A protein has these predicted regions:
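A generic, lipid-embedded transmembrane alpha helix
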Residues: 2-18
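Short aromatic-rich membrane-water interface segments that cap or initiate transmembrane helices
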Residues: 27-42, 155-169
Length: 189
């Protein structure tokens, strides 16, 4: 969990510094690390841990769920779609970086497919679909209050309720990075 958390904290701190988004101090405890509210830093550890639990439950309780050409095609298609988003919206930092980072990571998985045989794309897609339900509820509250304030000049201004559509892919990359690192763990027998 540490490498993705460090990556995201750096990304988040940079975007906060250049005003891609900001945090409303009325809703934070007032402790700041790396220019981010403490709650935001802790998010990058707590949320992936919960998401890995959901992913592992899918793996354990649904052993018949296997990676197929369909699940791999869906994930690869997401990579193509977000890369297209990055190219079209190259002048919008949130859209561009989120699309580019997720596309590169997905294509990296496919490039190293033989070495990353442990990755289970079907379980990832099902678990991420489940994760999106609480994500939409909590993120909807955070963006509606607003705890997190987005600079619309840096995203495509397409929202699901009050949530920028890029947040879905931002979260997907966070979960995907953690799942890949988790699956590389040694198996204890």
């Amino acid at each position: 969990m540490m490498p993705p958390a460090v990556f995201y904290i750096i990304w988040d701190a940079w975007f906060t510094k250049i005003n891609v988004w900001s945090f409303n101090p009325a809703y934070t405890v007032g402790i700041s690390l790396f220019g981010l509210p403490l709650e935001e830093v802790l998010f990058f550890f707590a949320v992936p841990y919960c998401c890995l639990f959901i992913y592992e439950c899918i793996r354990v309780y649904f052993p018949a769920l296997k990676t197929t050409v369909v699940s791999e095609t869906i994930l690869f298609s997401i990579g193509i779609a977000v890369l297209i988003m990055a190219v079209i919206f190259y002048d919008k930092k949130y859209s561009f970086c989120t699309g580019l980072f997720l596309a590169v990571f997905i294509f990296f998985l496919y490039y190293l497919k033989k070495k990353l045989q442990f990755f289970h794309s079907a379980a990832f897609l099902v678990s991420y679909g489940i994760i999106l339900l609480p994500f939409m509820a909590v993120n909807g509250v955070l963006t509606a209050l607003p705890v997190v304030i987005y600079n619309n000049a840096e995203n495509i201004s397409c929202r699901i309720f009050s949530i920028p559509v890029e947040d879905i892919f931002y979260g997907m990359l966070l979960v995907l990075m953690n799942v890949v690192l988790y699956e590389r763990r040694p198996v204890i027998k």
